[in-house]
Amino acid sequence: MSYIQKQGKNTAWRVALMRNLTSELIVSERLEITETRAKELRKHLDKMVTLAKRGDLHARRQAASWLRNIEASSKEDVLQKLFTTIAKKYKDRDGGYTRILKLDNRKGDNAPMVIIELV
């Protein structure tokens, strides 16, 4: 499929990467990664925030099947943070939950780097 950024890896690797990056972005709310990964990550994060805004049990289970179970703080994990803090923050916003800011290219391989953050 031409709309998927394959990044030279197999499907399992790409899915695992996106699950990890989505969970990490919810925890830290800001990541410094390559531009291609950030553009692909944006799609997955928008879906997770939309599920969190819906807020029902089925949406919570769908999000739980995608996100890694890591602690966001000593009091809450990723799923709780998504459904409480982030869902309330974006309840009046229809899409566009992330911002991508360009940085200089990476020194080792000249890959275009960006900062992706929650708006």
UniProtKB/Swiss-Prot annotation:
Q: Does the keyword Chaperone apply?
A: no
Q: Which InterPro entries match?
A: Ribosomal_bL17, Ribosomal_bL17_sf
User: Which superkingdom, per the lineage?
Assistant: Bacteria
For this UniProt record, give its keywords in alphabetical order, as a comma-separated list: Ribonucleoprotein, Ribosomal protein
* A single GO molecular function term of this UniProt record: structural constituent of ribosome
| Binding partners and assembly | Part of the 50S ribosomal subunit. Contacts protein L32.
Which gene carries the instructions for this protein?
A: rplQ
Q: Name one GO cellular component term.
A: cytosolic large ribosomal subunit
Recorded protein name is Large ribosomal subunit protein bL17
- Family stated for the protein in its record: Belongs to the bacterial ribosomal protein bL17 family.
Query: Which BP terms does GO give this entry?
Result: translation
